[in-house]
Amino acid sequence: MSGLSIRQRLALELHRQLIKDAQHNHPLHQLFWESTLRCNMKCRHCGSDCKVSSVHPDMPFEDFRKVLVRIKEKYDSHKIMVIVSGGEPLMRDDLFKCGRAIYDLEFPWGMVSNGRLMSQRNIDRLLASGLHSLTISLDGFEEDHNWMRGTEDGFGYAAGAVEIMAKEPGIKFDVVTCVNNRNYESLEQFKEYLISLGLKKWRLFTVFPVGRAAQDPDLQLSNERFRGLMEFIKKTRKEGRINASYGCEGFLGEYEGEVRDNLYTCQAGLSVASVLIDGSISACGSIRSDYHQGNIYKDDFIDVWENRFQPYRDRSWMKKDLCGDCKWFRYCQGNGMHLRDDDGNLILCHYERLK
């Protein structure tokens, strides 16, 4: 990898101070609610263990509502985005009531959906419930998407929802695509397809090697293809026809400032928190290792947010092994928390992949 430019280094130094401020002040900006583990798909890479939905039934909304009321007592609710996740949130019959209640508490709210139940009627009901943002997963053309999602008809529903939402004013809307070895070669054609649907914002992810995804070679890009993905995003951004960006994870060296709207930082525990299906208080919903900081059924959320989360806000414990003598640790801070196992070991380094 070639070195970073002077412009990039200056930007990273300025950004480093912003990260320090966030570690100290930890302003809550985004709260995920894992509302259900039920799902209507069988995704190859799924991070939520939807097979245990019978063990962990849907969280009663009133339990989560109490958390929101407590947060509203302390912070400005207008500045905190509530993201309803799953599973598939639309599996909840009361989702629209939940959304409206969140809206009535003056929190903006959004959701992440696989699109399977995103009919025009349900979209209208979501909008009437005060929906502020929506993300739909679309992992390539029909054959590739359905393969990834473990369904025979998922593509049509998701693509239809994208076409509807792309025309909806006033909603923050984007599509996320998990790039893998099946859809990699068709990214250029898929980009043109998304543009034809009217999409303005497209996030591309790679699947991190945890759980079943770690053992599936179709899901893990080679280092060469990973760099190719960075070049594709960089080129697409320069074209200016669709706002493409790489997912939030990973310090990307020479690609910092080139493939995302912002420079890398893991906001887990700094500005992002989550309430999981069992009441656990955590940070980013992608974190599957045990870095929970409390539980809403026995702890006060505000007390947990303001006085715990030390492993997230002081990353010095990560400066070991591969990160021990890395000159980029001052900017990377040990990569995302979701890329640490239960013992604190690093699972994946994006910078190493780009060397």
Describe the role of every protein-language-model region.
Residues 10-27, 286-355:
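Flexible mid-to-C-terminal extensions adjoining Fe-S/redox cofactors in radical SAM and related proteins
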Residues 27, 37, 266-267, 320:
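Residue-level preference for beta-strand/loop junctions
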Residues 35-42, 270, 323-325, 329-330:
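Cysteine-centered iron-sulfur cluster-binding motifs in ferredoxin-type domains/subunits
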Residues 2-133, 221:
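Conserved alpha-helical substructure of the radical SAM core
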